[in-house]
């Protein structure tokens, strides 16, 4: 598997300001500011898959009560998230759980490179936030019909199942709620554009995620000490 500077998916870099309005950097700066003003117990980091989660009622129902922050930027790749985390989005906070969901936008990378990029994110979190338990969400299938990107995302998940157990304080959560039907298609009822999830689909994946987060929060030393007091 590709690691370090030899892996382009593991090289931190800011997104190019293609449209010319500097929105990507503005969003990053807002997240850095949030780190100075808020005290999250749970931090979500990733791309538009994380972004849209915050737009549905399931976020307010399950995650807002956990003092969660959502550091999303649509279109982000592993390299973009690495850059953001290296440049302030992990400073001045001490979350107990960090959820990472990124990789489906790494179109130009191999499965090995994408998995290596996700591992690099986990290693960075381990270094900068050693107290945090990390949850990596598996990449979902995409496209209405079978296609190479589906196959690549599945391979990324397979690679992560083998590699992540070797890293501390991290586990992979498969959140595919059977989105691919027996005929190989994905319904727009689950993914409205055959990539991004509908509210109903988020409800399916968030229940096991919420259960795992609650389990990890209860396992933190602070919670244990409080229970013994």
From Swiss-Prot:
Forms a catalytic dimer which is either homodimer (alpha2/alpha2 homodimer) or heterodimer with PAFAH1B3 (alpha2/alpha1 heterodimer). Component of the cytosolic (PAF-AH (I)) heterotetrameric enzyme, which is composed of PAFAH1B1 (beta), PAFAH1B2 (alpha2) and PAFAH1B3 (alpha1) subunits. The catalytic activity of the enzyme resides in the alpha1 (PAFAH1B3) and alpha2 (PAFAH1B2) subunits, whereas the beta subunit (PAFAH1B1) has regulatory activity. Trimer formation is not essential for the catalytic activity. It is an enzyme of class 3 (hydrolase). Coiled coil: none annotated. The keyword Lipid metabolism applies. It comes from Gallus gallus. This is Platelet-activating factor acetylhydrolase IB subunit alpha2. Belongs to the 'GDSL' lipolytic enzyme family. Platelet-activating factor acetylhydrolase IB beta/gamma subunits subfamily. Its EC number is 3.1.1.47.
């Amino acid at each position: 598997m590709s690691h370090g500077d030899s892996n382009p998916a593991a090289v931190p870099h800011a997104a190019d300001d293609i449209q010319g309005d500097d929105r990507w950097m503005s969003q990053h700066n807002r997240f850095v500011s949030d780190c100075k003003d808020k005290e999250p117990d749970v931090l979500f980091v990733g791309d538009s898959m994380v972004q849209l989660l915050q737009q549905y009622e399931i976020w307010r129902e399950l995650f807002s009560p956990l003092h969660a922050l959502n550091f999303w930027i649509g279109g982000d790749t592993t390299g973009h998230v690495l850059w953001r985390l290296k440049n302030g989005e992990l400073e001045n906070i001490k979350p107990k759980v960090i959820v990472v969901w990124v990789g489906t936008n790494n179109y130009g990378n191999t499965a090995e490179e994408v998995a290596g990029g996700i591992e690099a994110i986990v290693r960075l979190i381990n270094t900068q936030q050693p107290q945090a338990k990390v949850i990596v969400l598996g990449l979902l299938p995409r496209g209405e019909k079978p296609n190479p990107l589906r196959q690549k995302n599945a391979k990324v998940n397979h690679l992560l199942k083998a590699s992540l157990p070797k890293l501390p304080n991290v586990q992979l959560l498969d959140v595919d709620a059977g989105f691919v039907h027996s005929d190989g298609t994905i319904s727009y009822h689950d993914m409205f554009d055959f990539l991004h999830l509908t509210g109903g689909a988020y409800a399916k994946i968030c229940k096991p995620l919420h259960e795992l987060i609650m389990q990890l929060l209860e396992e933190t030393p602070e919670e244990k000490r409080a229970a013994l007091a």
